[in-house]
């Protein structure tokens, strides 16, 4: 049974009649690319695309970047095109 004190912050879980455990909920942030005045996803903008690529050169998943599914697909396609056109490296060198 979950009892919610503050729906977005904490909840108390009661397991039988034993001890109560606190369960913390984090409110999911909105998509940073869906807000007004957000930058346009374009393969010619490597400064934006590099923010969504890991240190090793892999594309970061949407659960880490908080990007919605529609924008994540556009990002992935833009990163792939930028790599083919040599605007982004396929693999980043270890420093």
UniProtKB/Swiss-Prot annotation:
Keyword RNA-binding listed: yes
Q: Name one Pfam family in it.
A: Ribosomal_S18
Instruction: Kindly list the GO CC terms recorded for this protein.
Output: cytosolic small ribosomal subunit
Keyword annotations for this protein, in alphabetical order, are: Ribonucleoprotein, Ribosomal protein, RNA-binding, rRNA-binding
UniProt key word Protease? no
Gene3D superfamilies documented for this protein: Ribosomal protein S18
Give a GO molecular function annotation for the protein: small ribosomal subunit rRNA binding
Q: Name one GO biological process term.
A: translation
Q: How does it assemble?
A: Part of the 30S ribosomal subunit. Forms a tight heterodimer with protein bS6.
Task: Describe its function.
Answer: Binds as a heterodimer with protein bS6 to the central domain of the 16S rRNA, where it helps stabilize the platform of the 30S subunit.
Q: Which PANTHER family match?
A: 30S RIBOSOMAL PROTEIN S18, SMALL RIBOSOMAL SUBUNIT PROTEIN BS18M
Classification via NCBIfam families: S18 (TIGR00165)
- Which family is it part of? Belongs to the bacterial ribosomal protein bS18 family.
According to UniProt, the name of this protein is Small ribosomal subunit protein bS18
Where does this protein come from, organism-wise? Rickettsia felis (strain ATCC VR-1525 / URRWXCal2) (Rickettsia azadi)
